[in-house]
UniProtKB/Swiss-Prot annotation:
S-adenosyl-L-methionine binds at residues 180, 209, 214, 230, 290. The active site is at residues 315, 349. The gene is trmA. GO terms for biological process: methylation; tRNA processing. Belongs to the class I-like SAM-binding methyltransferase superfamily. RNA M5U methyltransferase family. TrmA subfamily. It comes from Campylobacter jejuni subsp. jejuni serotype O:23/36 (strain 81-176). PROSITE patterns: SAM_MT_RNA_M5U, TRMA_1. This is tRNA/tmRNA (uracil-C(5))-methyltransferase. It catalyses: uridine(54) in tRNA + S-adenosyl-L-methionine = 5-methyluridine(54) in tRNA + S-adenosyl-L-homocysteine + H(+); uridine(341) in tmRNA + S-adenosyl-L-methionine = 5-methyluridine(341) in tmRNA + S-adenosyl-L-homocysteine + H(+). Dual-specificity methyltransferase that catalyzes the formation of 5-methyluridine at position 54 (m5U54) in all tRNAs, and that of position 341 (m5U341) in tmRNA (transfer-mRNA).
Amino acid sequence: MSLENFGNFLTLDEKHSFIKKYFKEFYTKDFKLFTSKDKHYRTRAELSFYHENDTLFYAMFDPKSKKKYIIEYLDFADEKICAFMPKLLEYLRQDDKLKEKLFGVEFLTTKQELSVTLLYHKNIEDIKSNLENLSNNLHINLIARSKGKKLIFKTENLRQTLNIQDRKIFYEFNNDCFIQPNTAINEKMITWVCEILNTQKRMDLLELYCGYGNFTLALAPFFFKVLATEISKSNINFALKNCELNNTTNIHFARLSSEELSLAIKKEREFFRLKDIRLDDFNFSHVLVDPPRAGLDKSVIDLIKKYENIIYISCNPITLKENLKELSLTHRVEEFALFDQFVNTPHLECGVFLSKV
């Protein structure tokens, strides 16, 4: 979430100075600051296409003024994206069927791979052979989408390897998953959590909003058992696959919303999706939450404040502060970290570790 409503904070020092004052009622110790390189850090990029005089350009549009900006290069994007952009544009310009009613493109990279998604306002079945030729000729994992349709050429799944405390963690996911878009900062976030856990007495972990297992796989060795919840079926399937990739056997995944889990733990409702999981067998010493921008609702706060230790990863300092007003009634902020996920922008990612008072 952007801090632009509070000021034009672009550098990490400026963001740090603001956050220090903004959270002073909860935390007065030193913040840990994690920097990012200022170019080629972002692994995801979305662009529009602009058509003029029978040719094609990458473009961005100002959401307020609707003014268009022709884009030739994205210095914040991963090097693989930057290298591929002109090759793709040149190919599309030479194929009238491919460029007709083409309105957008999404690039996604990992350390090893790249995938491209083309977005159309027409039936993509009519250009299936052209799309297949594009994928083969440019040696690219290609996805094409139009209303109600999706075509995949080669594969839509990407593989990723993260380096965490001298360990390699292996993942597979696709561009429908929520992905931390700055891999180096993602590794620093996970490592920060691991370093805290190294100093802690640990039993079992409860993780909400686990996605495809980004944190889960790296944290599992610190605990006897892990219960991780997520509402997306495809994310759960990737998380299970990622357990196999890492030979991890102590994680139990449940396709439940946080509100549903709260009802299940309080024994107010039974869920068929929990038929193979005995909640009474868990002794949670830690809970990890990485919620969407809206933060945690009251039912989730009421659930997690029962546990001794809370790790809160936040993409929105505003809702984080609101949630800390509730959590500070039972817990104290012990550690606060700032991650410069999007360099030279007002965006800031926060990590907070709380323990019971």
